[in-house]
Amino acid sequence: MAERGASGGGSGGDSLDKSITLPPDEIFRNLENAKRFAIDIGGSLTKLAYYSTVQHKVAKVRSFDHPGKDVEQDHEPPYEISVQEEITARLHFIKFENTYMEACLDFIRDHLVNTETKVIQATGGGAYKFKDLIEEKLRLKVDKEDVMTCLIKGCNFVLKNIPHEAFMYQKDSDPEFRFQTNHPNIFPYLLVNIGSGVSIVKVETEDRFEWIGGSSIGGGTFWGLGALLTKTKKFDELLQLASRGRHANVDMLVQDIYGGAHQTLGLSGNLIASSFGKSATADREFSKEDMAKSLLHMISNDIGQLACLYAKLHGLDRVYFGGFFIRGHPVTMRTITYSINFFSKGEVQALFLRHEGYLGAIGAFLKGAEQDNPNQYSWGENYAASSGLMSTSPELCPTQRARSGTFDLLEMDRLERPLVNLPLLLDPSSYVPDTVDLTDDALARQYWLTCFEEALDGVVKRAVASQPESMDAVERAEKFRQKYWGKLQTLRHQPFAYGTLTVRSLLDTREHCLNEFNFPDPYSKVKQKENGLALKCFQSVTRSLDSLGWEERQLALVKGLLAGNVFDWGAKAVSDVLESDPQFGFEEAKRKLQERPWLVDSYTKWLQRLKGPPHKCALIFADNSGIDIILGVFPFVRELLFRGTEVILACNSGPALNDVTYSESLIVAERIAAMDPIICTALREDRLLLVQTGSSSPCLDLSLCTSRTTTCMVLPFAMWVLWTKLKSLVEKCLSPLSILLACSVLSAKSRLDKGLAVLVRERGADLVVIEGMGRAIHTNYHALLRCESLKLAVVKNAWLAERLGGQLFSVIFKYEVPTK
């Protein structure tokens, strides 16, 4: 039986090369601000984890204090924009060969200036071997952590925090990688760690797991026997040999024993009846490749059958495989997958992890950071700084990316608040946000990658224009271009590098790269100008709507919503118009819309519903700033309020393209309330609530909504106005203690613990309105909800419109009622 907690072994750590020059800007980022360390040292690879603070720029908006000013005659912008420095938390994970150990430790020691920690958590077999070296170099005490505990903690962490972390490997499919959506409940599962031996662990909860079995036949067996059979000493070279071999030359198959009679047994003739069975009777020599392939099949089948038996014994249908034996090698994943499928008859899933190599380091870090309670936060993968899955050739083991052949990177940003499933999802476990999987659709993948490449010049130009006073804006924008272009080229060759490739992930990666080079909100000035212009038109639009009869007004409101949605700077067809024709406005956008019947047209059904009783509460996910939110969404909100429906208006927490942010929506609502008694009364009576989604994406993932809030997130509007005025006053006149007291008074009267998910439950939301291409077409088009839903957008991309069976500016108006 394998020793409990055994990890991978190997040589390679004896040669400590100090002459290596490390690229610090790319590898050990933010090291000077590192606060806590952990390390997982295997036989040949080391994984380092550290927590650091990152300073970056954020765009802030603040309302001008102009009481009683006529908005229609006001020529000043509705708010001011400032760029401030903000500090956030980030986790860094680096994987490198043990050959680099001493050079890396020297580099860390020379650049470690702000750490307060005196301890480094260490796990893995090498934690003992390198203990003295680490303590000498870093002058930190090494605390050794249990290998299995660290693996489980790390596995739980990545399954909860990284979308598309787990995948099935299907060699003969296109794509080979089938990523799993994050399940709201990851437990229970089986973890099979294949190091030198095999450990099998049943994981039931965050803190409860049990070692239930193992085997002495594991990665060490493959390596050892392989070395004896082939005289090949390196593990990866053994796998390369195996990938080129034909096991049937060495193994005795069922058809070799039974001939054609195997069909009467219900068995395939190609099944292995006896591993290495032919070697006992054949006189000829066998090739190294064939022997390596036979050995790999023998060990993988043994492990697969063992895992399958334990899974069935404990009633589990998910088995995650990890350990140095796996390491993303296609030939290994293929044989294990085949074994699991065969022995379980398809009832048990063999799953692998994108970041399985980091599990021990992540777990060791979490053990050391328990007093900081890192699990109370949500964490997100930073696409700009992470290297993703390594590339693979069809048969051989993974080849390293040319960018960095020795170092592999993962970075995760701490989000401001925990994110949870929207309670209105019909079945969170089967919810898939994205409409099209680009890893699966080659034609769509090539189109969208080309589309994002062609748009890159415009994004760079917009980024530079957003910071006219910055001396280095052009230089930073060029670095952004190179970084994002590189990501797009990686995704052309490895569409699976960051999990399932979608339009959403391409947009999010672009936003991550912009933030990486301190372009937090390239469209801030565009939004400021468009919000100011739209506010001047608000009263005339509502007066026009109020003059219509009821039925005519409902259609006008919907057309207003759709016309507002045209103003999307992320769509080239629109940005070209807006840049060439500055006079293009609300009425012109209405004329662009497809005439009814629309491409998807549920309007008649919606109108019929409006003739019934009002909805209790509507949750509206807004899209763009300017005309969209002010002349499209707010008149629609106003009508719902007039009918007696409460409204929760949800906007992005952070900027993305020209999408409206929560902080901008507060100022816009303040200005509209000064003009409109319906909006003003609803805000004062807490029937119109402004909330943030927790997202900074042009798309919408309903499995990632805010579960709790920070100050002012769901502050009643009158309280927010009072807060902003009082804050301005106390900053000028009062001491810090007085400010603190004033804040505490306001906080006590506000609902600080009610985030979007909580509000939806409390208010009994029975209607969800999702607006815009990113939120209602690229994502959530097929999302099933427990309540009525309205998904509407204007298709502003000709290729997508044609795919949907329409033309540019076709209309999607999809009203759905859940089955009883």
From Swiss-Prot:
Main location: cytoplasm
EC identifiers of the protein: 3.1.3.-
Gly residues bias spans: 1-13
Region listing for 4'-phosphopantetheine phosphatase, in residue ranges: 403-820
Pfam families in the record: ARMT1-like_dom (PF01937), Fumble (PF03630)
Knocked-out gene: effects: Knockout mice have a body weight and a lifespan similar to wild-type animals. About 10% of the animals start developing cataract at 2 months. At 15 months, 50% homozygous animals are affected. Heterozygous animals develop cataract later, with 10% animals affected at 9 months and 25% at 15.
One example of a Gene Ontology biological process annotation: coenzyme A biosynthetic process
Cellular component GO terms held in the UniProt record: cytosol; extracellular space
The name this protein goes by in its record: 4'-phosphopantetheine phosphatase
Species for this entry: Mus musculus (Mouse)
Gene from which this protein is expressed: Pank4
